[in-house]
Structure formats: C-alpha cells, structure tokens
Amino acid sequence: MSLQELSEQELFRRESLNKLRKLGIEPFPAQLYPVDALSKEIKDHYDEGKEVCLAGRIMGKRIMGKASFAEMQDSSGRIQLYFNRDEICPGEDKALYNEVFKKLLDLGDFIGINGTVFKTQVGEISVNVKTLRVLSKAIKPLPLPKTDAEGVIHDAFTDPESRYRQRYVDLVVNPNVKETFIKRSKIISSMRSFLNSKEYLEVETPILQSIPGGAAARPFVTHHNALDIPLYLRIANELYLKRLIVGGFDGVYEFAKDFRNEGMDRTHNPEFTQMEIYVAYKDYIWMMEFVEEMLETICMDVLGTTDVQIGENTVSFKRPFKRISMIDSIKEHTGIDIAPMNEIELRATCEKLGVETDESMGKGKLIDEIFGEKCEGNYIQPTFITDYPVEMSPLCKKHRDNPELTERFELMVNGKELANAYSELNDPIDQKERFEEQARLSEKGDDEAMFIDMDFVRSLEYGMPPTSGMGIGIDRLCMFLTNNSSIQEVLFFPQMRPEVKTIKLELTENEKAIHEELKKVNKCELQELRSSLEMSNKAWDKG
C-alpha cells in the first residue's frame, strides 16, 4: 500500500511510530513483559495499595495537564489508569509523559504498566501508574463507537460482513462477541468432560480420505501428488469410528472438522465441527436418553439453567424430550400417510404439497424433502424424530418391528436438526446391498448419494457388536446456547466470498422479495418477517 492510499489517521500514526524510534523507544519490543494481574481480578478482589503489573490496549485517554486518565483493555475487561507526570517521570526528563503518553500513544496501542490499586473520589477502582512501557504500536485506528450527548451511538462496528472478515477487530471493540466465543469454549469443554466421565475414548481419524463416506453430501476434492490419486476432505468420520468399534473399543468419540461442498446460509458453513460418538452394545433408544442427559448437563454447566432463550422462544433442555416417528410427524402436519406410498406416489404427493423435486431424487430423498418443507420448522422444543424409512438411512439398522423403517432419530430444536443417531447397521451383506442402492442413485444424478466403501464392508465381515452412534453439530449447539441466529456468529473466521470479486447471485422471485424486505428491517424483526412470508426453512435460508 502506497502512502497516497493511507488515511490521515494512518499517516499520523506512522509519524508517531517514527518519533518513538527517534526518542530511542522501540515500538515493538521483543522481550517478555511480566504481567501478574488482570483488570477483572483487580476489580473483583479490591486490595488498596496492592502493586500490580498490567498490559493491554489503550481504549480511551483524558489528558488534563500534569495528570491524566486512560482506559486500558486486557483479556478480562477494562480498568482505569491514572497517570501523574512527576510519578512516571521522577527526574528532570518529562518526555515519557509529555511526548510519549500525551502525544505519541494512540487508541489501540498496547502498553505495560506497574502501579498501585486505589479508588478515585467517585469510587472507581483504578491503578496509579508508576512505570509505563510501550509494547506495540497500532498503525490503523480501531473503529471505536462514540456516544453523543443524547445517548446516540455513532461509528459502531456492526456491519456483519466487516465483522466476519475482520474478526480480530470485532473481538476488540464488541465485548459481547468475545463472550460468545468464551461460551463456545465452555460448551465444548463441558461436553468433553461429560464424555470422559463415561470413560469413552477420544480419538482422531483421517481428514484426507480416499473415499468420503459416512454421510450424504458433496465432498471437496484434492489431489495427492506423490501417490497421484484424488483425495477428499472428509464429510463425516463415521466409518472410521465404527472400524475402531470392530477393533475392540467399547466407546469412542471425536470432535471432528468436517467439510461439505454445498450451499452457505445462516445455519451452514462448508467447514464445520461435529462430535460423533459410537458405543458398543447400545441401541438408539439408549442413545436418546444419553443425548438428553448430555445436553441437560451442558446447559447446567455453562448457563446454570436448562431454560434457554433462542430468539423469541424459550427452549427447555430439561429431560425427557418429546418423541414422534417421522411418518407420524408428516401425517400430523400434512394429513397424509406416506407409509404405503411408492416413489411415483411420493412424487405426486410432493407436487400436491408444493415441494420442489427433481428426477434424481429417490424415495428416501422425496420423504426427506416433504419433512424438511412441512414439518421440521414446527419443532421448537427438543423433539426426537424417530424411525426413518429405510431408503433414507443406508448406514442404519432396520427397525426391529418393521423392516420398512430404520432405528434412527434426529433431534430437532428450534426448527432445526441438532443431532442424528442410529442403531448402527452391522450386517455386512445388508450394508453392501445398501451401498449398491446408493450407487444406483448416483447413476441417476443424485450427487449426494453415498460413496461405496468396500473396506468398511470388509471390516463388518470380521464382526461388529451391536452399536449405537450419534453425531451432534457443535456450531449449531453453540448458536442455540448463545442465542445467535447465524452460524457466522459462532465461528471465529467463517467462510466468506473473496473481497476482490463481485459475484452475482441468481435468486428466484421469492428469494429476491425476501432480500429486498431484509434491507428494510432490523435484526429483531426477522422472525416476524419470516412468519408473515410463510416460507419454508429451505427457501428462507437461501433467500
């Protein structure tokens, strides 16, 4: 970037940088700084006269002659600093105060201070600074909001695209964003502690795979130069974890980064985090109770309550959760019994219900589309949707009482899928036949049909005990427990379009209408707008 492209503020800060060096002060020192306290700790445990060593960013300055105040922000919060010229410059040379602090330090710069804790006349806990050291110079100004005399906030850093692209700035100037990610860390920590308390083993499985199995999704493709073969970023870790059950482990789990080369919207990112667990000698009924206990425990650990505010809804994660079969759910919300229908009849039913289809969709996909459009969004309180048709679940065991169904559930919360679980298919002959059916769907053009993994079939031929498996979306769980409506709010660095390119999106007329309406409304009105437009989950998310 040339000097001509710099703003007035950036030019001023670079000039200050050079002046610091001329004074013999290194703006980016290498040696450690011996921090021994945090602002929150000082405020929570006030100890007058205690000597402390702090470091952080300058977020505010009030210059008043020989004495001044500054606000410093560290990793735990903010605290007021008091600077007296003669205390930080006890000798004849007053340049550290008169030149460095007053003129050359800007908002956003990092400093280190030693001082003593005290309270001002108005009772604000502060630190009386004795020594000052420059730790890092910021040559771009932070977008700090300002509040005018009427209480109106100006220059707030609120544009979502800017916030997601420059999360490092977002975290500095918007404390609530930092709290969201601290809570995310606590959610994952609580889940891991719960799983470890059950003595299940945390494992790692390959991210680069020769066959991307375990889910119905489009993979990312890459190439291994040394082996001269195509490889795929995993879409799920299911098949590798089940191989470990074959190998003799009774319970394994993994927090996995998975990748799906599909659409992006408020609840989907191409790179996402899942936790998958497989436990031998269990079934999907046991797994429902396990999931209930786990989610209730996490809510109590992180929030101190099982009642969670998600948008306009108060959702209770108190056990037990409601249960309903998929066929009964479709019948409840459409009045149609799909149980006896073949593919032709299902296609006609989709047309009657206004559900979009294409020729590549088989029976299972058609049922999935009906449920997604007409039922899914109605389940606000945690609800297990159980007993899926066999065509929808190629890795799942057939139902013990009805071979047309499978022992599968999905947990719906706030109108979205949160978890998916099976009584796992461990019959290698049946598994091979299911894979072959997926191959036929792929030939019809279904790019979400599962890949055939014959090595996995071979592993089953050595024998896998009865097993229940479950996958839960960590990003979506974090959305729910932090009351965020967008997945981008719970990912530090969500996938974004390149800044240098302008890409025109092709939208339907309905989606264009949503886009135009969204320009006119505030975030708090989104749910009301969605209700008034009567759009399905899929059309709303894309729009």
Label each region the model flagged.
Residues 1-504, 526:
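Class II aminoacyl-tRNA synthetase catalytic cores and aaRS-like
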Residues 503-517:
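Short alpha-helical segments that sit at the start of domains
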Residues 519-525:
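Short capping segments at the starts of secondary-structure elements
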Residues 528-531:
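A short acidic, leucine-rich amphipathic alpha-helix
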Residues 535-543:
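Short amphipathic alpha-helical interaction segments
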